[in-house]
Amino acid sequence: MFTLKKSLLLLFFLGTISLSLCEEERNADEEEKRDVEVEKRFLGALFKVASKVLPSVFCAITKKC
């Protein structure tokens, strides 16, 4: 009987550890997704600014306006 309790306790402990590791991995994946979304938003804003500034810079450099 003691051996059965011991093995069940061991299984419960290992299952708990496994579950906590899965949750940590899931949280790490969610953080990476948020980082990618922020990068996409930053690049979009950068392209908008560049599209407004580059023509005037090109005009000033080549002096063909």
Swiss-Prot record:
Compartments reported by the entry: Secreted
Keyword Secreted on entry: yes
Leader sequence residues: 1-22
Proregion residues excised on maturation: 23-39
Pfam family name, one: Antimicrobial_1
Disulfide bonds: 59-65
Tissue note: Expressed by the skin glands.
Keywords in alphabetical order: Amphibian defense peptide, Antibiotic, Antimicrobial, Cleavage on pair of basic residues, Disulfide bond, Secreted, Signal
GO cellular component: extracellular region
Predominant cellular place of this UniProt entry's protein: secreted
Entry's Gene Ontology BP terms: defense response to bacterium
InterPro entries reported for this sequence: Antimicrobial_frog_1, Frog_antimicrobial_propeptide
Function as written in the Swiss-Prot or TrEMBL entry: Has a non-hemolytic activity. Has a broad spectrum of activity against both Gram-positive and Gram-negative bacteria, fungi and protozoa.
Family: Belongs to the frog skin active peptide (FSAP) family. Brevinin subfamily.
Subunit text: Monomer.
Record's protein name: Gaegurin-5
